[in-house]
A protein has these predicted regions:
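Gram-negative outer-membrane beta-barrel transporters
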Residues: 630-722, 787-791
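Face-selective signature of the C-terminal outer-membrane beta-barrel domain
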Residues: 357-380, 401-517
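Acidic/polar loop-and-plug regions of large Gram-negative outer-membrane beta-barrel proteins
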Residues: 280, 284, 297-364, 377-409, ...
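Membrane-embedded beta-barrel scaffold of Gram-negative outer-membrane proteins
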Residues: 364-366, 370-376, 382-386, 553-554, ...
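Acidic, small-polar-rich N-terminal luminal/periplasmic segments of exported/outer-membrane proteins
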Residues: 36-39, 44-49, 63, 92, ...
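C-terminal beta-signal and adjacent terminal beta-strands/loops
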Residues: 608, 712-729, 747-792
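Structural signature of Gram-negative outer-membrane beta-barrels, strongest in the C-terminal barrel
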Residues: 305, 409, 428-430, 436-440, ...
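Outer-membrane beta-barrel translocator/receptor signature
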Residues: 208-210, 221-298, 304-308, 355, ...
Length: 792
């Protein structure tokens, strides 16, 4: 059925295209003398100097251009000035081509520095439409590959420090990092790679990232079942027809070293490749904690026809790591042990394997319309064994429980998208529509040790007890296999009513079905088939944009999303999903031709039908079953975000931001087991802020010398669990103080060589990330990291 719907949907849009009005357009291609397409070349057209740039395939186009005779000019450093007159005819496409005289070796040494406002760069993956952020009634932030390189980031958690309001909520067991935005966890369904869901149970590799996109607020229209805090999308590097590459070696504190190889180039006039590979081996500021990672990322590009491209990418990660549940808590207080103290069994170990393969087909139907098909397969496998859940007594005695975990997931996803532009009267439309589907099989294993506890230690005095060193074995008692199918149809249109007024309207219909089957192996083999739980919902979106001038944009928007629930109603029916409303207003302003860009956003997210334990059963008696729920609770998240980016001088970049968030329970049932009205949700700091500065001296005797600094602030927050009515202990929360980390860096580039040195957390600040109440992990102390790079 899904396949038939896809075909019908595709045929409908192709037939629609045949009636779409075409205006005078220009398409062209620029190649080198060797026949290779050239990207990033500037093309100027007409007396009013309308400009464009060639893409990775050397292609450029101008849409809706006035008819008549016009002059195309190519004028760039290292190239001879070329001009050509062309005639633009109404409703037709005029095609031109240029061949540049320089050889590839000459061209690849040309570096063009562009001062362009981030509000005016066209982004394609998260916004759906190929539109400028200035036209989007929503907050979007991009962390570029240049910033990732300058800051010597080795973890995604370091990248998101550049995005205000996004922070690490926990680092459970040292196996993964959980990111939060606007009071919501982004880990489960909101982590994407190249537009596809990425299992959040691993620590992603950043060496292959071209950029990281963060779309704040609801993205349900494009991605369906996602939480409303925001979407994080990792965009990987792609092949290039320009031959080149680099070798990078990083070394730092605690025996950290990481070589990286990145090389790319043409295989023929129509094919190009890229390969990125890394190996990481490191100790840790935590005693007995190590990590050993291998990552491979091959990709291929094939130019089938001048209008059709195919990109294939592979991805392989093998990560051997030490499970580390941190320092533990005594009551509400983080245990007073040193930052380096490791409390797990010395034989504890874990391994994560993650493999993916994706294919993208893009076809340019004409100058106004393009079609794309994207498909991806992902395999995830994580296993760990050790002692866990550090909950010692007041005197430090801790009976270490044993734990073994294994989780696997296979995900197959597909997307068909069509986007284009047309006009109805004086209104210009930029539409983006499509279908997506996903099938996932997740398997969660349950293991039992006999006995369940390993031994007793004292976290303050290691000599108090005799520590065991043998490695026990566990028995597999159960596997829960959950099959989840998702399907969605969506359409979005940006209407330019006038030059000043724009309207973004869209809607999505999502369907999801999940079935969990339980395979028991103890005390005897049995299979318990689960019931199919279906969720379906419409997710509308409406945004208004007013631009009094090209450098100012005021916007407001409304969007709706849904979150599936577990449990049943008082009549024993599956619980419907919770629907969440989000309102957002803001202003985007550029100063001094884009040298300074500012964004101010205010938002409110309301879940007005939060699932909570029902007060009464259907017969009117008191309910004590926490699986029986009603949709009569509420949470509200509201806040403000400020983002500022500046390029005041050549080679200088400044980024800063501030975020305030207030996420609370605003309505509860008040029955035993329900949350307390007015309480702030755990892991949601009220205040976060970031600042970064980087400057590379462009001329003079000190040319190539670089200086940088970075500051990140995370405010007071609560770890542990939110308190509930009738709980047996006084307080389940863990208060955590706010903290600030400061990094500084310096480097030097000479010809093809560069060296960069970073000192992080220079004040040696101490704080913790807390997952519930049992994984209390200290942040890294002062460390040094040095990178040596050679480009070829």
């Amino acid at each position: 059925m899904i396949a038939q719907i896809k075909v019908l949907f595709l045929l409908f849009f192709i037939s629609f295209l045949s009636t779409a009005q075409e205006t005078g357009s220009i398409e062209g291609k620029i190649i080198s003398k060797d026949g290779f397409p050239l990207s990033g070349v500037t093309i100027k057209l007409g007396k009013k100097i309308t400009s464009s740039k060639t893409d990775a395939n050397g292609l450029f186009h101008f849409d809706n251009f006035p008819i008549g005779i016009h002059t195309i000019t190519i004028d760039a450093e290292g190239l001879k000035r070329q001009s050509q007159e062309i005639k633009v005819v109404a409703n037709e496409i005029t095609r031109v081509s240029f061949t540049l005289e320089e050889e590839m070796q000459t061209l690849k040494e040309i570096v063009i520095v562009i001062k362009e406002s981030p509000n005016k760069k066209k982004e394609t993956v998260l916004s759906g439409l190929n539109i400028k952020p200035m036209d989007l009634p929503q907050s979007i932030q991009i962390v570029s590959q240049a910033v990732i390189t300058q800051q010597q980031t080795i973890r995604l958690s370091e990248v998101v420090k550049n995005v205000n309001g996004v922070y690490v909520g926990s680092a459970r067991g040292g196996a993964q990092e959980s990111f939060w935005s606007r009071g919501y966890d982004m880990t489960a369904n909101n982590m994407l790679k190249n537009g596809f869901r990425q299992n959040g149970g691993s620590i992603p590799e950043v060496a292959t990232l071209e950029k990281v996109e963060v779309l704040k607020g609801s993205a349900a229209l494009l991605f369906g079942n996602v939480t409303p805090g925001g979407i994080l999308n990792m965009v990987t590097k792609t092949p290039s027809f320009t031959k080149g590459g680099e070798i990078n070696f990083q070394a730092g504190s605690y025996s950290f070293y990481k070589p990286t190889l990145d090389f790319y180039g043409p295989l023929s006039k129509k094919m190009a490749y890229r390969f990125v590979g890394t190996y990481e081996n490191s100790g840790s500021f935590r005693n007995n904690v190590t990590r050993d990672r291998v990552y491979l990322n091959p990709s291929f590009f094939y130019k089938v026809t001048p209008k059709t491209d195919i990109i294939i990418q592979g991805d392989y990660l093998k990560d051997n790591w030490t499970p580390d549940f941190g320092t533990g808590v005594i009551g509400q207080i983080v245990a007073n042990v040193t930052r380096a103290t490791y409390l797990g069994a010395l034989w504890s170990n874990g391994q994560t394997k993650q493999t993916s393969l994706s294919g993208l087909i893009k076809h340019q139907l004409n100058s106004d319309w393009k079609l794309s098909f994207n498909s991806s397969f992902q395999n995830y496998d994580r296993i760990s064994i050790g002692t866990e859940r550090i909950l010692p007594l007041a005197n430090g005695d801790w009976t270490r429980p044993l734990g073994q975990n294994k989780a696997t997931e296979q995900i197959i996803g597909s997307q068909i998208n069509i986007q284009g532009t047309f006009t109805t009267g004086k209104i210009k439309h930029q539409v983006f529509s499509g279908i997506d589907s996903e099938n996932a099989l997740a398997q969660a294993y349950t293991f039992v040790f006999n006995p369940a506890n390993y031994d007793i230690i004292n976290i303050f005095d290691a000599s108090k007890f005799l520590t065991r060193t043998d490695i026990p074995t566990a028995t597999t008692t159960k596997i829960v296999k959950t099959t989840t199918n998702r399907f969605g149809v969506y359409a979005q249109d940006l209407l330019s009513v006038t030059k000043q007024f724009k309207v973004l309207a869209g809607i999505r219909w999502s369907w999801q079905e999940a079935v969990a089957d339980t395979y028991n192996f103890s005390p005897q083999n049995s299979i318990v088939k689960g019931d199919a739980i279906q969720n379906k919902a419409f997710s509308p979106k409406l945004g208004l944009v007013y631009q009094p001038n090209p450098n100012t944009s005021l916007f407001s928007s409304y969007s709706n999303s849904f979150i599936p629930n577990t449990g049943v109603t008082i009549t024993n029916e599956p619980l419907k999903p919770s629907l969440i409303d989000q309102y957002e207003i803001g202003i985007k302003k550029d100063f001094w031709k884009g040298i300074l860009s500012t964004n101010l956003t205010l938002y409110q997210i309301t879940n007005s039908n939060l699932a909570q334990t029902a007060e009464f059963k259907s017969d009117g008696t008191i309910n004590i079953d926490t699986n029986v729920k009603t949709l009569n609770g509420a949470t509200t998240s509201k806040g403000i975000e400020i983002d500022i980016q500046a390029k005041p001088a050549e080679g200088m970049t400044i980024m800063t931001g501030y975020s305030y968030n207030d996420m609370r329970y605003t309505k509860t049932t008040g029955v035993t087991g329900s949350f307390i009205e007015g309480d702030r949700l755990v892991r949601t700091p009220a205040n976060t802020a970031n600042f970064s500065f980087f400057y590379t001296i462009p001329i003079g005797k000190l040319k190539g010398l670089s200086l940088g600094s970075m500051m990140n602030y995370t405010g007071e927050r609560l770890g542990g669990y939110n308190n509930t009515i009738g709980q047996t202990i006084p307080d389940r929360t863990i208060p955590l103080n706010g903290y600030t980390t400061i990094d500084v860096s310096t480097g030097y580039t000479w010809k093809k060589w560069s060296i960069l040195c970073k000192l992080s957390n220079i004040t040696n600040e101490l704080s913790y990330t807390v997952h519930e109440n049992y994984s209390v992990n200290p942040i890294a102390p002062r460390q040094i990291l040095t990178s040596l790079k050679y480009k070829f």
